[in-house]
A protein has these predicted regions:
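Aromatic side chains
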Residues: 8-9, 28, 87-89, 96-98, ...
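Conserved aromatic
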Residues: 10, 30, 73-76, 120
Length: 181
């Protein structure tokens, strides 16, 4: 629906969509008044002059997260219950498997790319698990932090007995979903 120069998408009851929403394979966003977001970037997702998101890894990740989280949670769950549902989903060997993938840490947005790749392929290493859990946590309202460090291990073959590893911190708590595999 267009009112003057402002575009809206409305449901069958005439209510404008607010927040991120999907129509077909496209991602849109309505502001608090339901006005379609255009020529703007919100939460790393860039919207064009027609009001739908560019088809880049940020929009694809957002869509994947919306799909998965809507399947594994419900609106009656608390934020912490949703986080636990995300944890259970990600650490279930029936949903994901361990596979080696070394991201380009110098590439801007590598965390989102790694999370997207893991969600669509089903496989990842510690960085994939950490980035995916962080992306899921962010989607439900947390402010996660992906940590890159070194822990005891021999995977890297380093003489000091340490190996590179990635994990997540959320509200001061440490989460290591890859450690479940």
């Amino acid at each position: 629906v267009k009112v003057g120069k402002t575009s809206y998408y409305v449901d069958t009851k005439g209510h404008a969509y607010v927040g991120f929403f999907k129509l077909g394979n496209r991602l849109y966003r309505g502001d608090v008044k339901g006005r379609l977001t255009k020529n703007k970037t919100v939460s790393n997702v860039t919207f064009n002059s027609k009001g739908y998101a560019d088809n880049d890894v940020n929009a694809k990740l957002k869509i994947e997260l919306m799909n998965v989280i809507s399947r594994i949670t419900n609106p009656g769950m608390s934020k912490s219950q949703k986080l636990y549902a995300c944890w259970c989903y990600l650490t279930s060997s029936s949903n994901f498997y361990y596979s080696g993938y070394w991201p380009d840490f110098n590439k801007k947005g590598w965390q989102r790319e790694v999370a997207y790749n893991m969600l669509v392929s089903g496989g990842g290493d510690c960085y994939g698990f950490a980035c995916t859990f962080a992306a899921m946590a962010r989607e439900i309202g947390y402010n996660p932090y992906v940590v890159l460090g070194r822990v005891s291990g021999t995977r890297d073959g380093a003489a000091d007995g340490l190996t590179s590893h990635g994990w997540v911190i959320i509200d001061g708590c440490y989460y290591d979903p890859e450690a479940q595999f």
